[in-house]
Design a protein with these regions (language model features):
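Short acidic (Asp/Glu) and glycine-rich catalytic loops that position anionic groups and cofactors
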Residues: 21-27, 37-41, 90-98, 134-138
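Catalytic palm subdomain of template-directed nucleic-acid polymerases
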Residues: 25-38, 141-158
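Hydrophobic, well-ordered secondary-structure elements that form the walls
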Residues: 29, 112, 119, 139-141, ...
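Extended, well-ordered alpha-helical scaffold/bundle regions in very large, multi-domain proteins
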Residues: 22-60
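Single conserved hydrophobic/aromatic residue that forms the stacking wall/gate
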Residues: 1-11
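Conserved phosphate/anionic-ligand binding catalytic regions in large, soluble enzymes, centered on
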Residues: 16-29, 102-105
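C-terminal polymerase-core module
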Residues: 49-101, 144, 148-190
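Active-site palm subdomain of RNA-directed nucleic acid polymerases
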Residues: 111-137
Length: 190
């Protein structure tokens, strides 16, 4: 969508990607990335031309939710939206955006919970007791481990996190990738 690779363009691409997931309007996008309404509309149109499946997903999700009053994440967990058919445009619009977003955010949260459970079990066995899971921030997990064990523990973390959705109940055609950084403290990891 945006040809060059400057930091400003990276920010714009991220704003468009996340904005669409959250149901951003052309006016909201224009304000966020500091372009005209017309340019924002062109970005959104180009995005949906390049990724028509996303628009299909959004429309299908809203249609399903209007009929059923709920949506499911990839694990089947339901989120209810009782006001999705409200006569008030603002209420209805908010519910539509939330219904589109709930399966995405809910699925991501569930994947993280499953990864944390698996890692907690794996790291609590006798030979991994020196490693502690300290913190979760969105889609990141922070661990503390002795330097001499970092390589071995890194492999365990990558293996467990990337395979969290490979089971009898859940199998996805798109692999989960895991980026892992090591450092002396949290500030050096980014």
């Amino acid at each position: 969508l945006l040809g060059s690779r400057g930091l400003g363009d990276v920010y714009k691409r991220q704003a468009i990607n996340f904005g669409i997931i959250y149901g951003i309007s052309q006016y909201g996008l224009a304000k966020q990335i500091n372009v005209t309404n017309h340019e924002a509309e062109e970005f959104l149109n180009a995005y949906f031309l390049k990724f028509p499946e996303i628009k299909i997903y959004m429309d299908r999700t809203i249609k399903f939710c209007r009929k059923s009053g709920f949506v499911n994440n990839i694990f089947g967990r339901r989120s209810h939206f009782i006001n999705i058919n409200d006569k008030n445009y603002n209420i209805r619009n908010f519910q539509e955006r939330a219904a589109i977003n709930a399966p995405i955010q809910g699925s991501a949260a569930e994947i993280m919970r499953l990864a944390m459970i698996r890692l907690d079990k794996k790291l609590s066995d006798q030979k991994n007791q020196n490693t502690k899971m300290l913190l979760q921030i969105h889609d990141e997990l922070i661990f503390e481990t002795p330097k001499e064990e970092a390589k071995r523990i890194s492999k365990i973390i990558i293996d467990e996190m990337s395979s969290v959705v490979k089971s009898e109940q859940h199998s996805f055609s798109i692999p989960l990738t895991v980026d892992l950084n090591t450092g002396e403290n949290w500030g050096t990891l980014h």
